[in-house]
Amino acid sequence: MATGTQQKENTLLHLFAGGCGGTVGAIFTCPLEVIKTRLQSSRLALRTVYYPQVHLGTISGAGMVRPTSVTPGLLQVLKSILEKEGPKSLFRGLGPNLVGVAPSRAVYFACYSKAKEQFNGIFVPNSNTVHILSAGSAAFVTNTLMNPIWMVKTRMQLERKVRGCKQMNTLQCARRVYQTEGVRGFYRGLTASYAGISETIICFAIYESLKKCLKDAPIVSSTDGAEKSSSGFFGLMAAAAVSKGCASCIAYPHEVIRTRLREEGSKYRSFVQTARLVFREEGYLAFYRGLFAQLIRQIPNTAIVLSTYEFIVYLLGERA
């Protein structure tokens, strides 16, 4: 009986810690997420740059001008949003993000903890296989449950309204999706999210390995008390940042495909069709649009989420 009660308390602890970590991370990094989503969109206004081409051997020696489309950078998109829409637009989609991020992170970490417990009884305890399967299972459940909220968030972030014009709130956006596309509209981009499970698996496999290395490190083992707690906290932040950075670079293209699938009135219909269309029309570099914004958003965000999660579990777990 006591064991069942203890397991229930542990699950609630992981739910609470995961929810707190996700909420803190979402608030701090919202502007970067809006910029990243705009960069990923097919509706991004590309700048036309004219490069002179000199043709040698011509009688006049005159050059020709070749127009080339150039993707605007992070700072240019930021400047455009501030000038045309105002600073408030940098927090577009924060409402559904806050509504979804706490339960999303809570469900994820609870599923991860429970799956890890189950897989430890099947495979070598705390092995990479256990971490990979646990992370993949938790991501699959979370993506399936939370996709409608993330769909609404993306639509709100892609909405462009000039300064002074009224923007849709969360409920209005959800109503519009339902009226124009039905229930299926809320699940657009879900296949891309499933493809993105690879990022989660890579991230947590690296994170757990780094965490184990930090735990076994002689410097950490030799410290005591407050020094150990402080060094451990910053060590976890560094481990989270490195793991997310590596995972993001490897699996980033699915993010661009997911954003395209969630665009309103989109020509994109399925994961494979979208990948082919983007490659044919824009080239392979289009799959990495917004990667820099993603890295400078996700690395600190993941560091905040994971370290807050571990810190709360440590604090409340000790008092329990």
UniProtKB/Swiss-Prot annotation:
Gene Ontology molecular function, alphabetical: pyrimidine nucleotide transmembrane transporter activity
Its membrane topology: Multi-pass membrane protein
Species annotation: Mus musculus (Mouse)
The Solcar repeat ranges on this chain: 9-118, 126-213, 231-315
Gene that produces this protein: Slc25a33
Protein name: Solute carrier family 25 member 33
A family per Pfam: Mito_carr
Transmembrane segments: 12-32, 49-65, 121-141, 190-210, 233-253, 298-318
InterPro entries: Mitochondrial_sb/sol_carrier, Mt_carrier_dom_sf, SLC25A33/36-like
Keywords: Membrane, Mitochondrion, Mitochondrion inner membrane, Repeat, Transmembrane, Transmembrane helix, Transport
